[in-house]
Amino acid sequence: VKNLLIENKDALKSMKEGDSKSNIRMTVKAVGDMLVSTNIVAAAQIPLAERESGITRIVQRQPFLLELVNVGTISSNLWEWVQQANKDGAAGMTAEGVKKNQIDFDLALASAPVRKVTAFIKVSKEMLDDVDLIESEINQELSEEIKLVIDAQVLSGDGTGQNLTGILENATAFAAGTFATGQANEVSTPNNADALRVAINQVMINQFQPNYILMHPSDVAAMDLAKATDGHYILPPFSTNSNTVVKGIPIVSNTGITEGDFLVGDFTKSGVRFREGLVFDVGYENDDFTKNFVTILAEARLVHRVKSNYYGAFVTGDFAVAKAAIAKA
């Protein structure tokens, strides 16, 4: 209709000016079906798409160690402490006129250095200006990357180079003790829960009170699904209905633990001190300025330690090896 009106604009003008003899006949084409493929030209934006706000991020493991250990701050680049070593003698009951009991020990200085965790992203100034939320998304990404590295280092850093010395590096290996095959407390057809119960006992006879058990999600699921030969689910008497607590100690499930392994410990004996918390810096580096690039940098400085006198607070092992070690002959 619009095109027909345009074609007859002169006649319409005459009618407007009072020419009663003017008339217009407009023939409209036959009605047809309207289709996206035929009635909407390629450049048209109809219908409009609906886009969700925000950015869908890649799924990553959730860090968890800092929620379990002793965390604080430090004002130096070296954490030092004094600990007892080579203790001799002991207190005892003493008769009248008899020499009293003597005790002596050495004092040893120990230390752990502060290490730095860093990550950066280069992004164009145009992208920061034109893409909504990109700066906050980059900050969140860098933050998560730093936290994941800290988490992994506190758990399993090997202490070499710029690595922290993690809990597993100093943890005590699983030892069956009196539960070993052939010993008085050997276990008939042991399962994963039995292995954990013996590990808990090991921590306790080392004079520590375990407060967390770390396991891979698949191993937790295996415990949940364990059945007897008649098909009923096995639930040890020292475990809760959901198998999330063993002998009063909660299980923390995370893929940071290698499948098949476990760690039982008193996590108050693991210490983290931050020299510098998570910090973000934004600036130009090298030829960034001439290329319109901005560098966003995130870093943190921290130290982790488990005192040598506390190594017995943590027991780590492999489920298969542990079960074989306590199995009744």
What does each model-found stretch correspond to?
Residues 1-107, 253:
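Assembly-associated, polar helix/coil segments characteristic of icosahedral protein shells
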Residues 76, 114-118, 291:
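Short, solvent-exposed loop/turn segments at the edges of secondary structure
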Residues 49-61, 134-150, 154, 199, ...:
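Short, Φ-rich (hydrophobic/aromatic) sequence segments
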Residues 74, 80, 158-302, 311, ...:
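Extended oligomerization regions of viral-like shell subunits
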Residues 85-90, 118, 127, 148, ...:
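Short loop/turn segments at secondary-structure transitions that flank enzyme active sites
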Residues 95-199, 311-329:
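Alpha-helical scaffold segments that mediate packing/assembly in large oligomeric complexes
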Residues 93, 133, 224-228:
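A short secondary-structure junction signal
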